[in-house]
């Protein structure tokens, strides 16, 4: 993501936490009073930012409020810092909001073994595992509980400096599912 920011000259780096012009798009309305984002839309949240950052505490409650308000949409975000989720959830989260999908990223076996046990224990209704950037073969069989994991996706890196992602690794994940 940051390579693309650099390529397009946005000057946004991993250390900057900011709200962009589309920050409140999920709750914006058209002139006729309808939602700008129609019902049934999957809202991919914070794909170039990080909802669970400590310095996002000032605006994170707004995001949870929109999620409650727009139960007619799906909100999807993923993180490599799943250990921060519990302290960032809203008080009324319970077992998770029905319209939120949370993905946990893993790029190698070490990260999978560290993140996925916690991910499976957290109160989340809709879970997905994202093997990205897939940097090595993974054995995820012990984590792929079909009662808890709804989806597994895999991808490599892009750009000139991308490290290899081997087809055999992706095929192995499919077979594990």
Task: Briefly describe each language-model feature range.
Residues 5-14, 21, 25, 98-100, ...:
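Radical SAM enzyme [4Fe-4S]-AdoMet core and its adjacent flexible, acidic
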Residues 68-72, 104, 127-130:
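Glycine-rich loops and low-complexity Gly/Arg-rich segments
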Residues 1-100, 109, 138-146:
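Conserved Radical SAM active-site core
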């Amino acid at each position: 993501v940051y390579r693309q920011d650099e390529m397009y000259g946005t000057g946004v780096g991993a250390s900057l936490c900011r709200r962009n012009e589309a920050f409140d798009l999920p709750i914006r309305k058209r002139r006729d009073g309808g939602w700008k984002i129609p019902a049934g839309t999957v809202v991919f949240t914070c794909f170039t930012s990080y909802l669970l950052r400590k310095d996002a505490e000032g605006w994170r409650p707004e995001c949870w409020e929109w999620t409650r308000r727009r139960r007619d949409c799906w909100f999807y975000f993923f993180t490599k810092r799943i250990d921060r989720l519990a302290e960032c959830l809203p008080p009324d989260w319970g077992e998770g909001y029905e319209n939120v999908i949370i993905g946990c990223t893993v790029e190698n076996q070490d990260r999978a073994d560290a993140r996925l046990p916690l991910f499976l224990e957290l109160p989340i209704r809709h879970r997905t595992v994202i093997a990205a950037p897939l940097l090595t073969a993974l054995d995820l069989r012990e984590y792929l509980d079909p009662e808890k994991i709804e989806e597994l996706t895999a991808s490599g890196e892009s750009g000139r400096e991308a490290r290899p992602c081997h087809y055999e690794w992706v095929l192995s994940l499919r077979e594990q599912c």
